[in-house]
């Protein structure tokens, strides 16, 4: 569980079954919706279901927010096969910041996942939750250059919101930082 993350507050009681997700996608397609985003916790704990949904709905595009720790060579090959699943790998900056918020070894696993994806020429991006402590780092040219070198095509930036039992108000960016 990541420091200050709201997703863990819900536990797994709100997880949808494969059939429920499939039904939502079918209903969405009837309405002209062909792009779907998986969020967490960690969506890749259900890799098998995600790949099956990608295969079944090959006319749709899927994006998943992930810490990247479950992307291995086999899963990267499956992504290459389906061609319609794009991960946004969560990093909080460089190693110290990412591991500090997401757990020791997370950064190394995320970088390894980026390597598997880049080797296969699979599109992926990064997802960053900016805080009072990491904003300077994740907005730096050095950070962008590193992520581009590792193959990232896009970046999502989310403003930290202190929500839930583990909220850390000191991580909230200052008004001056938010203007940056």
Where are these regions (language model features)?
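Active-site donor-binding loop signature of nucleotide-sugar glycosyltransferases
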Residues: 7, 159-160
